[in-house]
Structures are given as structure tokens and as C-alpha cells.
């Protein structure tokens, strides 16, 4: 059994999703939640909350591997920079505990789950719910975190079949 922590980083809310993968490659939902960072003071205090909150979550759930969504250029450069800072704090929380970090672009996650890189949030939420047999509507950040964990599980399974590491299984010639 392998436990994967998926992280959808954000400067206001960071999505957390944890799944277990059995020997047959089947995914089982363990936990999902938003890590709310608003109301934690200034931006540096929010980053501190993210670092400590993820650390506590890692200590509680003991994942074997971590998958995190890459930064994308969104509405503005300032937003992208804040997202990059939050992502950096999340990665620090992970590597401080000697866990491997695997990174996936949002388009790669959408392609892996829905079959098209331009899928919308509703399609991703729906597919995550189906794949993990979850009832009710998922919040977007939790769905994205679970989606990146599922994507890593698929890449991991493909890598094992091919006898390569996960980076080789996912990389493409440019």
C-alpha cells in the first residue's frame, strides 16, 4: 500500500488530498480538506501557517510520496508570485520530512483525469468523485489536490510497468 498526498497550493486556501494505492493499483480516498490561510495575519504569517499545517498533516497521515501542482500564470504576475511562494512553503514542508516531491502542471492533471488538458473545474471534480467513489460535490481546491494525487498514482503505475522512474515515465521530448 502506498499513500500519496496531493497538494493544490494557494496563498489563501491550499487544497489537501490523500489517497492510498493498493498493490493492484486501485485508489482509495483517505482524506481531503482545505488548509485555510486567510485570517492568519500578513502574507508571511500565512506562509508560516501553511508550512506548519502541512507538517502536522504529514505527521498525522504519513504519506509515502507527495504530488504538487505546478505554478501557472494566472490573472496577474503578483498572484503568480504569491502562488509561487505558497508552493515553495509547501515543498519545504515536504522535503524537510525527506519525502519525494513530484510536480504536475494543471493541464497534465486534467489530461490524465478527464482526457483533455483544457477540461474545466467541474469536469475534474466530477471525475475525481467517480474515481474515488465520493458522494456530494467536492470543493475545487480539494478536488484539485485529489486529482494531482490520482495523476501521480497513474504515472507511478505506468513507470512501474515500464521499469523506469516516474520522471522518465512522464517526461516528453521537446
UniProtKB/Swiss-Prot annotation:
EC number: 3.1.21.10
Transmembrane domains' residue ranges: none
Subunit structure of this chain's protein: Homodimer which binds Holliday junction (HJ) DNA. The HJ becomes 2-fold symmetrical on binding to RuvC with unstacked arms; it has a different conformation from HJ DNA in complex with RuvA. In the full resolvosome a probable DNA-RuvA(4)-RuvB(12)-RuvC(2) complex forms which resolves the HJ.
InterPro entries reported in the protein's UniProt record: RNaseH-like_sf (IPR012337), RNaseH_sf (IPR036397), X-over_junc_endoDNase_Mg_BS (IPR020563), X-over_junc_endoDNase_RuvC (IPR002176)
Active-site residues from the entry: 8, 69, 141
UniProt: Mg(2+) 2 binding residues: 69
Organism name: Xanthomonas oryzae pv. oryzae (strain PXO99A)
One of the protein's GO biological processes: DNA recombination
Database matches in HAMAP family: RuvC
Superkingdom: Bacteria
One Pfam entry name: RuvC
Reactions catalysed, as given in the entry: Endonucleolytic cleavage at a junction such as a reciprocal single-stranded crossover between two homologous DNA duplexes (Holliday junction)
Function of the molecule: The RuvA-RuvB-RuvC complex processes Holliday junction (HJ) DNA during genetic recombination and DNA repair. Endonuclease that resolves HJ intermediates. Cleaves cruciform DNA by making single-stranded nicks across the HJ at symmetrical positions within the homologous arms, yielding a 5'-phosphate and a 3'-hydroxyl group; requires a central core of homology in the junction. The consensus cleavage sequence is 5'-(A/T)TT(C/G)-3'. Cleavage occurs on the 3'-side of the TT dinucleotide at the point of strand exchange.
Cofactor binding remark: Binds 2 Mg(2+) ion per subunit.
Annotated positions binding Mg(2+) 1: 8, 141
Name listed for the protein in its UniProt record: Crossover junction endodeoxyribonuclease RuvC
Positions in coiled-coil regions: none
Stored CDD domains: RuvC
Subcellular location: Cytoplasm
Keyword match DNA-binding: yes
Keywords, sorted A to Z: Cytoplasm, DNA damage, DNA recombination, DNA repair, DNA-binding, Endonuclease, Hydrolase, Magnesium, Metal-binding, Nuclease
A molecular function (GO) term: magnesium ion binding
